[in-house]
UniProtKB/Swiss-Prot annotation:
Entry's localization field: Recycling endosome membrane
Keyword Membrane (UniProt): yes
Function field: Involved in retrograde transport of recycling endosomes.
PROSITE patterns to which the protein is assigned, alphabetical: PH_DOMAIN
GO biological process, alphabetically ordered: regulation of cell differentiation
Species lineage: Eukaryota, Metazoa, Chordata, Craniata, Vertebrata
Recorded topology in the membrane: Peripheral membrane protein
Free-text domain note: The PH domain specifically binds phosphatidylserine, which is enriched in recycling endosome membranes, it doesn't recognize PIPs.
Organism expressing this protein natively: Pongo abelii (Sumatran orangutan)
Protein name (database record): Pleckstrin homology domain-containing family B member 2
Amino-acid positions noted as binding a 1,2-diacyl-sn-glycero-3-phospho-L-serine in the UniProt annotation, renumbered to this chain: K20
Amino acid sequence: MAFVKSGWLLRQSTILKRWKKNWFDLWSDGHLIYYDDQTRQNIEDKVHMPVDCINIRTGQECRDIQPPDGKSKDCMLQIVCRDGKTISLCAESTDDCLAWKFTLQDSRTNTAYVGSAVMTDETSMVSSPPPYTAYAAPAPEQAYGYGPYGGAYPPGTQVVYAANGQAYAVPYQYPYAGLYGQQPANQVIIRERYRDNDSDLALGMLAGAATGMALGSLFWVF
């Protein structure tokens, strides 16, 4: 930063209303700082013109104040602050008063410093990463307890073989076992085929016929 304007000004004290000579420095960032003397060791006060100052009065515009002895009111200026405080000053001459007025007015209306500060805050807000989440969301198959499927029939299915050897898949109703319960296993039911009784009937008929013929021959002899 650099000085925009520096010099001596008379300042009226707040309580005793006495005029005191102070050294003033106006910085390029808009800060007006005044000291006890030119050595700048003891700071009396400071005003951030773009933020704290709401008006600047000069000459006859100044209110409730009388110039110091030997000075006219045209050499006076007042800095009206936002918090209600008014800083009453008196320059060495009328030209010096106007020079301070224009310089302070430019510093008050210049919002480049404030805008850059706001822009920096917005940039940091936008570029900030989202909050870190330590726990990942569970996968759908973990949430519902279903494992990978690679068989020919879905889990919990009955395979029934009919008498003719045909296989049928029948859904199996099983109670819910919870999120981590045991998964149902495939069940295979094989029904035995019924024996073909046609061959037994034929053998029985042949045996009956042979028995009848033997008995007939026996009765014929007698």
